[in-house]
Amino acid sequence: MTIAIGLVAFDGCIGSSVHALADLFSVANTISHRTGGSPALFETRVLTLDGKQVTASNGHQIPSEAALTSEGDLDVLMVPGIGIEAVGELNTTLAKLRPLVDLLTAQQDRQIITTASCTGTLLLAESGLLNGKQATTTWWLSSEFSERYPHIEMQANEILVDTGPVITSAAGTSYLDLALHLIRRLASAHLAHLCAKFMIVDGGRTSQRPYSIPWHFMSRDPLLEKAETWVRNHLGAQISVNALADHLGMGARTLHRRFLRLGQQTPQAFIQEIRM
């Protein structure tokens, strides 16, 4: 039996999370055939909303093989990451992708596995497919995700969360972990192991925490920059959260809220991180 996999693509998607999946499932077919199994274990199709080609976030075009609405015989539907750089882009981006979200919502009664990687997990959250379930997402959006979707249990450090009909994976190339997991689940652990070896993919990753980057080094927010400069200039002294708050002209509670919003960490953790 051939497992039909729909690879969703849309304008602004992360191109590798479409093409790399097609490559990995193609390799799975080759290895399956070479080891006495089916040469057509997986069939992948690139699907867009209207069946027309789209442009990925890297500027390259992705041809479409069919429209999402015309594909009724899928076993798996895989949503790629969205090419965004900041939390402030979310509302506009999600509004543009509303037709896709509505289509995902309509998929809820179908007996298929739906997956999403990285920032694409927000599309599943918007669709309602994750309501009452556990999920993971890219590390830099985990706090925003939890704030937006309190009815979803965020597992921020996990590379992959499988709830049965819905699977989410973490940041960046976690789509490779996701593909290997599907091969393991739908074919065999042995085939997944061989694919991981052949493609030189670490199939044993369980946490994305080692890959996270402290946001104050990436953010250009004036408050965080001013705070970092002050802390670095006072590393030889005992620095308190209250002293930092005074320097920034606000109360400690306000500072705490601002840091959680901007840097996804407490002021105390911010200070300790710079000291290290």
Feature roles, as predicted:
Residues M154-I167, L194, F198-V201, R209-P214:
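Conserved Rossmann-fold dehydrogenase catalytic segment
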Residues S143-S146, H151-E153, I200-G204, I213-F217:
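HhH-family (HhH-GPD) DNA N-glycosylase catalytic core used in base-excision repair
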Residues N131-E158:
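A conserved active-site-flanking secondary-structure segment within enzyme catalytic domains
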Residues T114-T115, T136, Q155, I167:
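Structural detector of well-ordered beta-strand residues that form the stable sheet scaffold
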Residues M1-T114, L123-A125, R184, H193, ...:
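Extended, subdomain-level signal for the structured scaffold at the beginning of enzyme domains
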